[in-house]
Amino acid sequence: MARYIGPTCKLARREGADLSLKSPARALDSKCKLEQKPGQHGASRKGKLSDYATQLREKQKVKRIYGLLERQFRNYYKKASTKKGNTGENLLQLLETRLDNVCYRMGFAVTRPAARQLVSHRCVLVNGKSVNLASYQIKAGDAITLSEKAQKQLRVQEALTVAEQHDMTPSWVEVDSKKFSGVFKAVPDRADLPSDINEALIVELYSK
């Protein structure tokens, strides 16, 4: 599956926001000017965006945060729109309950791409069974454990240390770093999710 492998700073500048594509222990380089768009004329690009452009940029930002392609993201939106409740909130909850994202939230990896790699390399067990599908949907009460091989990896050990140092573990997961395991306690409410995401703009875009 196609994945972006270019400079993460370029993506962050394009969206004007930190997309959590780098470890919290390595802040975005001072050269990564988020207020300046990438490209030769980035510094001179000014002016108010149209409603459509604003909606599009918000969708692109969220896609890049979770590392999804357009087809994947649209499928999540379609699924969210068929569920009861607020479509935008449903969308974020579906994204947050992906296995790769839960591993990231538990601190097993410093970024979502790194968490996805752990999953694809069969380093993650859900309720005792190996799962290598990053999009696997986690349910309340599911137990996540890293394989013995993954537990020995320095990058995993460092990731857990970074998560503890930066207090990154959200309230809806419980982690035992010594056992390299965690429990997904509950699907997060909207109030528990990032406030810098305006999911209503995405709903408006796809509703057209």
From Swiss-Prot:
| Stored CDD domains | S4
Q: Which residues form the S4 RNA-binding domain?
A: 97-160
Naming one, the record's GO cellular component terms include:
small ribosomal subunit
What's a single GO BP term from this record? translation
Q: Which UniProt keywords apply?
A: Ribonucleoprotein, Ribosomal protein, RNA-binding, rRNA-binding
Q: Does the record's keyword annotation contain S-adenosyl-L-methionine?
A: no
The record, for Pfam families, names: Ribosomal_S4, S4
Q: Which domain of life is it from?
A: Bacteria
What is stated as this protein's family in its record? Belongs to the universal ribosomal protein uS4 family.
Q: What is the recorded function of this protein according to its Swiss-Prot or TrEMBL entry?
A: One of the primary rRNA binding proteins, it binds directly to 16S rRNA where it nucleates assembly of the body of the 30S subunit.
Oligomer status and interactors: Part of the 30S ribosomal subunit. Contacts protein S5. The interaction surface between S4 and S5 is involved in control of translational fidelity.
The protein depicted here goes by the name Small ribosomal subunit protein uS4
Q: Which organism is it from?
A: Xanthomonas oryzae pv. oryzae (strain KACC10331 / KXO85)
Gene of this entry: rpsD
